[in-house]
Amino acid sequence: MDKDWMVLLQQQNQLSKMMEVNRATERYGLSLSEQDAKMILAERNHALQRERRVEFGEGIAPQIIYEFCDSDFIEQDSYADTIIRLQEIFYMYKNEMQDEISDEELLHFMKEQFETVCFGDLDYLAGTCLAIFSQAIRAGYRGYRASEGRGEYGAFDEVKRWDYDLYLEMLKELCWR
């Protein structure tokens, strides 16, 4: 009986913490209903079971919310689903990187790629950016530690991106003859 009481109290604390983050996210036009928060917490448990992970404390969802709340690519209609998907991706790649990277480093890396390389595409984030980065981590790369995961993807990116200077030069040539 004591065990059930403790679990119930822990769940209530986690729910309270999830509802607290609304204060920070409301200025970005994002908020969670109590039902959304419960759904995120339930999906957290499923993701932890699927990835065979154990987590103590409040979980990663509040940190994900704080990290991603100012994104231009997250809208209110898909907010809860996006947080759930980011949570799943986070746990999957914590395992893939064999816990070599801290939560903060992984979150910073995820956010930077989500904004600048993936432009909000969660499948590209998980299937390309994090897959490539996790291979580097497993192979022994540790350069991310100095930058806390920021600015690291360029060294591993296999996809040719736009050359900004060339683009401007061509734009000037075409438009300002």
Tell where the protein language model's regions lie, with residue ranges.
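Short acidic DE-rich linear segments
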Residues: 2-4, 162-177
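Short terminal alpha-helical segments
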Residues: 2-45
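Acidic, low-complexity, intrinsically disordered interaction modules
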Residues: 31-169
